[in-house]
Amino acid sequence: MEVGQHGKNYIMSNFPIQKRKLKLAMLGMTEGNGHPYSWSIIINGKYNAQALAKCPYAAIIDYISKQPQNTLGIENAEVTHVWTDDPQDAMHVAEVAEIQNIVSNPKDVIGEVDAVLVATDIGSEHVERCQPFIDADVPIFIDKPLCDNLSDLEIFQKWIDEGKNFISSSAMRYCKEYEPYHQSTHELGDLRYVNVTMAKSWEKYGIHALETVYPIVGPGFESIQ
């Protein structure tokens, strides 16, 4: 069965009786950011313990090894392809997370996967990294921060207006510890000042602070320092 929408045909022969496993590509790695390791493990639900022990990010070794095995893995999704800026990193990520395919160019995954994850945290690079997949209508998850300058934000807004499929977020928005306050802060009284602790640089990690607060207080900030 084919269903056409906006000039495109979507194959639905297995829907809704069967769910086809989504094939994902993990793309990019920048200095100080080990997300390709941890995200691939979390999605695939498996890892090579001996290879993980050689991961250059001690924090990832620590929290992955402490995580109960049955909490890892996303049903009907698998990272099947990986590319990193340094080819040696891709080889190690693939070994750790048992990823089947290493590509020499990120564009090589177009037509091979259902979606890509741009796993880098330099906001000024994200328009360039995402452009080929936007052009090919491949859905994208973009690591935070989405961008760090107004001109790139305007490009992302244009893509939103055009109906392109991408998302970027801090996990802090979804922390269960804050969920009670997403609906009501009445018991806290009138909120006039909010202080949130964040790590490292504002450019890369400030979004964690903002995404913690925004679902609680909503829009209307008068000052941020």
Question: For each of these PLM feature ranges, what is it?
Answer:
Residues 4-136, 161, 218-219:
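N-terminal glycine-/serine-/threonine-rich beta1-alpha1-beta2 phosphate-ribose binding loop
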Residues 4-6, 10, 141, 146-205:
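A contiguous active-site-proximal alpha/beta segment in oxidoreductase catalytic domains
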Residues 35, 129, 152, 206-209:
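Residues at alpha-helix caps and immediate loop-helix transition turns in enzyme cores, especially N-
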Residues 36, 90, 178, 209-210:
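A general structural signal for well-ordered alpha-helical segments in protein cores
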Residues 38, 42, 155, 180, ...:
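Alpha-helical elements of Rossmann-like donor-binding domains used by nucleotide-donor carbohydrate transfer enzymes
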Residues 192-225:
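Rossmann-like dinucleotide-binding domain that binds NAD(P)(H)
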